[in-house]
């Protein structure tokens, strides 16, 4: 076989993104992929499912596992499940990206690091939000201190929001990939269904427009997702909360808040699906759903 007829070698691998809640893991994944796949908000615990983001460039395919934030507190069933998903993501991957926030180091960071000690894959420490560090001369001593805690393969200061050094991180990822066939077609950026992405978009808007009013005992169930004869997606979303007071928060005065949530969610869906969307939302009280493992299984939290 001549050189001209030979197919170029291809490389593929799995990358786990881990870290305590709210350090910017989802923002980093979205920046790498070039579009929003993982739900982002300023609240912790916004990522609940192991969303797989797929980035293919030339002969390289990196499959990213965006984990829920690891938690010390496991009093509720949903937190136990999120911890379990994050811990399982650490095993059987080619590279682990451990994301921390600036010069902060918390007990939660220490707990995540302790879980990584048993990992077989190399660990890259990504120090995120470095653009927010006011005293820049504190960064280098902080890096030195962290380097003594663990044998990191690399320590890289980044800003996921602004894209600073993300291209360097991607080069590190490429080097970790193994020679082998790609698992997904080149155009794929996620293995999640449109139905799942619709529920994530609605949940993101809930987080954004309820501010600190609404705790994490809220989820979204897509009851209908179909393409009608006019070529429009008809989507019905059921928002589950635990208390009547939370229902009132979501609906808002004269229904204004849920109207805003619906309008913003529909606009995002139309951009993502490249199609017209008719979205209807309802709010229902389902007491104790976040503590009920059967309810969590039916809502898709135990499909990992």
Curated annotation (Swiss-Prot):
GO terms for biological process: ribosomal small subunit assembly. Its main location: cytoplasm. Residues 19-26 are annotated as: G1. Residues 66-69 are annotated as: G3. Keywords: Cell inner membrane, Cell membrane, Cytoplasm, GTP-binding, Membrane, Nucleotide-binding, Ribosome biogenesis, RNA-binding, rRNA-binding. Residues 210-287 form the KH type-2 domain. GO terms for molecular function: GTP binding; GTPase activity; ribosomal small subunit binding; small ribosomal subunit rRNA binding. It comes from the Bacteria. GTP binds at residues 19-26, 66-70, 128-131. Residues 45-49 are annotated as: G2. Residues 11-179 form the Era-type G domain. It is a peripheral membrane protein. Residues 158-160 are annotated as: G5. One of its GO terms (cellular component) is plasma membrane. It is found in: Cytoplasm; Cell inner membrane. Residues 128-131 are annotated as: G4. An essential GTPase that binds both GDP and GTP, with rapid nucleotide exchange. Plays a role in 16S rRNA processing and 30S ribosomal subunit biogenesis and possibly also in cell cycle regulation and energy metabolism. Belongs to the TRAFAC class TrmE-Era-EngA-EngB-Septin-like GTPase superfamily. Era GTPase family. PANTHER family: GTPASE ERA (PTHR42698), GTPASE ERA, MITOCHONDRIAL (PTHR42698:SF1). Monomer. This is GTPase Era. It comes from Actinobacillus pleuropneumoniae serotype 3 (strain JL03). The gene is era.
């Amino acid at each position: 076989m001549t050189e001209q007829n030979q197919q170029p070698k291809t490389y593929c691998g799995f990358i786990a993104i881990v870290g305590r809640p709210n350090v910017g893991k989802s923002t980093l994944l979205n920046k790498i992929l070039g579009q929003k796949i993982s739900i982002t908000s300023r609240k912790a615990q916004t990522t609940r499912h192991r969303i797989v983001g797929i980035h293919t460039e030339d002969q390289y395919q990196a499959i990213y596992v965006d984990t829920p934030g690891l938690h010390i507190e496991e009093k509720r069933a949903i937190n136990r499940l999120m911890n379990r998903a994050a811990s399982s993501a650490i095993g059987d991957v080619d590279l682990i990206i451990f994301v921390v926030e600036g010069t902060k180091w918390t007990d939660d960071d220490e707990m995540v690091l302790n879980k990584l000690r048993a990992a077989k894959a190399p660990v890259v420490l990504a120090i995120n939000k470095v653009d927010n560090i006011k005293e820049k001369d504190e960064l280098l001593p902080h890096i030195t201190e962290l380097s003594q805690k663990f044998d990191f393969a690399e320590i890289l200061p980044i800003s996921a929001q602004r894209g600073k050094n993300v291209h360097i991180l991607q080069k590190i990822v490429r080097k970790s990939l193994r020679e082998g066939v790609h698992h997904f077609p080149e155009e794929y950026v996620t293995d999640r269904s449109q139905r799942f992405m619709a529920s994530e978009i609605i949940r993101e808007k809930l987080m954004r427009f309820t501010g600190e009013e609404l705790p994490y005992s809220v989820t979204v169930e897509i009851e209908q997702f179909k393409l009608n004869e006019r070529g429009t997606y008809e989507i019905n979303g059921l928002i589950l909360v635990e208390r009547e007071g939370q229902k009132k928060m979501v609906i808002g005065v004269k229904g204004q808040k849920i109207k805003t949530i619906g309008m913003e969610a529909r606009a995002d869906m139309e951009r993502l699906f490249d199609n017209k969307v008719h979205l209807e939302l309802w709010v229902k009280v389902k007491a104790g759903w976040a503590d009920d493992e059967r309810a969590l299984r039916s809502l898709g939290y135990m499909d990992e």
